[in-house]
């Protein structure tokens, strides 16, 4: 990859999309007495990593191995699609929330204009813990735009997939952003009429629509323009069973 000037950025998903890991390491969950099984289908599941010292020690070890394998300045830590049900029902998590002094917002966030829960802020704590560790190793993190919820880690780059708002909010606040909004650059969406195309996850992005996307809006202020550092097209393989697809 390096010989072709390609920088491979690894992604280690946390704290959601954890089911496969919890099946192997149930002690990383909020309820280690529960039986976890790898799902045979894609989806968003309520079983997530617990923000415990055991979990952080596990991820620090994982990151040490990742750093040895990938010279990239950046490591993507996910952060998307993390239901908070397990944390709301966990005595450990609720005690940690009180210990950290986290509270539900009473006024909208200055970054995204939304009131966030104390569990959202616990995810920010999780992300910030991992950011500090990776920063100490000379690495910077990238996370999906959900990492904005509850407060953004100081040096994080936001990858905006749920539209353009997350990336723009991050850029306006002085954080780097990579624009990858699903209404434009999800390349696994239908590109022609669904009746005549192979089955995909959904959506409808024509080639014309994708090429028409401008990652830096004309009305963006100078600070935002400075911090929009790139664009990414995404392909997810739930419905791609062959290399030809």
Give short role names for the model-derived ranges.
Residues 1-137:
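Substrate-binding cleft of carbohydrate-active enzyme catalytic domains
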């Amino acid at each position: 990859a390096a010989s072709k000037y390609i920088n491979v950025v690894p992604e280690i998903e946390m704290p959601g999309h954890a089911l496969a890991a919890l099946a192997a390491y149930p002690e990383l969950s909020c309820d280690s007495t529960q039986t976890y099984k790898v799902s045979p289908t894609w989806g968003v599941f309520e079983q997530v990593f617990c923000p415990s010292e055991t979990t952080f020690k596990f991820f620090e070890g994982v990151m040490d191995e990742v750093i040895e394998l990938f010279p990239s300045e950046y490591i993507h830590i996910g952060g998307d699609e993390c239901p908070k049900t397990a944390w709301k029902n966990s005595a450990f998590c609720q005690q940690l929330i009180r210990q950290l002094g986290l509270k539900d917002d009473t006024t909208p966030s200055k970054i995204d204009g939304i009131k966030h829960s104390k569990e959202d802020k616990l995810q920010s704590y999780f992300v910030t813990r991992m950011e500090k560790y990776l920063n100490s190793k000379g690495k910077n993190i990238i996370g999906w735009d959900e990492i904005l919820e509850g407060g953004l880690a100081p040096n994080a780059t936001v990858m905006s997939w749920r539209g353009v708002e997350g990336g723009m909010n991050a850029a306006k606040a002085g954080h780097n952003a990579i624009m990858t909004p699903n209404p434009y650059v999800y390349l696994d969406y239908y590109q022609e009429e669904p009746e005549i195309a192979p089955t995909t996850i959904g959506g409808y992005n024509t080639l014309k629509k994708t090429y028409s996307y401008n990652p830096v809006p004309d009305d963006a202020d100078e600070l935002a323009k400075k911090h929009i550092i790139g664009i990414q097209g995404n392909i997810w393989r739930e419905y791609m069973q062959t290399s030809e697809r």
